[in-house]
Amino acid sequence: MYKKARVIAFYLPQYHPIPENDMFWGKGFTEWTNVGKAKPLFKGHYQPKVPADLGYYDLRLPEVREEQVNLAKYAGIEGFCYWHYWFGSGKELLERPFNEVVNSGHPNFPFCLGWANHTWSTKTWSASNSQFKETVIMEQTYPGEEDYKLHFNTYLKAFKDSRYIRVDGKLLFVIFSPLSIPNFVEMKRIWNNLAMENGLKGFYFIGIAENYTVTNNTTSHSIKKRYTYSSLAKKAESVYNNLFEKGFDAVNSRGSNRAQVLSDSPLVYYFKRFMMKVFNLKIIVKYNYKDIINNYYVKEDKWDNVYPTIIPNFDRSPRACLLYTSPSPR
């Protein structure tokens, strides 16, 4: 018998201004700034995408957060996974919307946390990021044991909240870049111990992973192997098992890289990226949504401890020229 899928939507809190973004991008900058300036790049390209139900909303408003929940419930979504940005030594960004959700008790809708553990730089939000030198806005750091404790205690109220999503009684916690944490085993031990000291059953840690990943220490031989479908299929097993061996309870799988390679050809895929990186060329990289979906998943995504990702649409052209065309809910 098949169980009903638990659909959780990632929640980006970028839709409200903060001083750091004001400093680097101008007063009032949010994710809407680039969305509103987007233009069609070819005939039939649907841009700009003007938000319908809620307009260009501001996440500081509780009314907006309530309406988001109504839309989510209508779509059959169980809860939100709020991205939070903990850079180490107590430094956070974009924390206000989630803090208000926890402190106010509203909306009454399930949630969990995802740690977006990556450095912020000027390359993140600019569609023309190849045209200027990258500047670090906030660096991701991992100070060690005391910071793990501070991180946990900062979110303890959320962890104790009855709305927090659990798996087998454990707190679901997603990590964006799981292999970037220098000693995840230590973090896991500390957090589970602190959880139990506070009457909680511990954590269910999920690491995000592409089922096909290009690494910095790639050899020419392994590049050639990636040119075959079979090698791409085998890649997922080793990627997922690597995270399990490092102590993660589950994997949130993503297949964008793999799907793009197979929808193009490996040679064309790498050539486009080479030209963009080396010669700063702004190439429109587009794929048919159906081709992406047909190549997005692997058999390992059916494992009990692997949680696949659903992408109903993808158009990153406000930031960079990458998009999927002709998406359909069918």
Language-model regions, residue ranges each:
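N-terminal regions that are enriched for targeting/export leaders
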Residues: 2-61
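Aromatic-lined glycan-binding groove of carbohydrate-active enzymes
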Residues: 8, 184, 190-323
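An active-site-proximal structural segment forming one wall of the substrate-binding cleft
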Residues: 140-166
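Aromatic-lined substrate-binding rim segments of carbohydrate-active enzymes
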Residues: 68-73, 80-81, 87-113
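Substrate-binding cleft and catalytic face of glycoside hydrolase catalytic domains
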Residues: 105-136
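Conserved small/polar residues in nucleotide/adenosyl-binding loops
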Residues: 324-329
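Acidic-and-aromatic substrate-binding clefts and catalytic sites of carbohydrate-active enzymes
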Residues: 15, 56-63, 84-96, 180-183, ...
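Conserved, mostly hydrophobic/aromatic
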Residues: 9, 72, 169, 308
